[in-house]
Amino acid sequence: MKCSVLQMSRLSWTACVLLLPLLLLTLQGGVQGCFIRNCPRGGKRAVDSVQPTRQCMSCGPEGVGQCVGPSICCGLAIGCLMGTPEAEVCQKENESSAPCAVSGRHCGMDNTGNCVADGICCVEDACSFNSLCR
């Protein structure tokens, strides 16, 4: 049976149209989550429909803070510790494929951040001073 060039072109086009969605679904399924503070904007979590279901790890003296970044530990009683031995435990959050949820009162633009220490509000990729967090 001979196939004309036109038939082959239609066959190739149909195969591409059918295989492209399959390829995209496969790639999306292979994407792993990442630590809530080190994902690129619009990156891994943007395609992940699962919301964080676990609290971020405790850190700091006597575990009174919470991890809000790979080397950042914040708490109401301790402020924010960055790059200190007490914040080193926060590196373990990077090993988890599931993002964690930072606890604290909502703050920031459109209430997308959380108060993590006295006067400090952290959003997805940055922390700043915020009078709502007092």
From Swiss-Prot:
Main location: secreted
Organism (species): Terebra anilis
UniProt-annotated location(s): Secreted
GO molecular function, one term: neurohypophyseal hormone activity
Signal peptide, first to last residue: 1-33
Gene Ontology CC terms: extracellular space; secretory granule
Pfam family, one: Hormone_5
Xref: InterPro entries: Neurhyp_horm (IPR000981), Neurhyp_horm_dom_sf (IPR036387), Neurohypophysial_hormone_CS (IPR022423)
Entry text on domains: The cysteine framework of the terepressin is C-C.
Residue stretch(es) of the prosequence: 44-50
This protein's UniProt keywords: Cleavage on pair of basic residues, Disulfide bond, Secreted, Signal
Tissue: Expressed by the venom duct.
Keyword Coiled coil applies: no
Top-rank taxon, per record: Eukaryota
Disulfide bonds: C34-C39, C56-C100, C59-C73, C67-C90, C74-C80, C107-C121, C115-C133, C122-C127
Family in the record: Belongs to the vasopressin/oxytocin family.
Protein name: Terepressin/terephysin
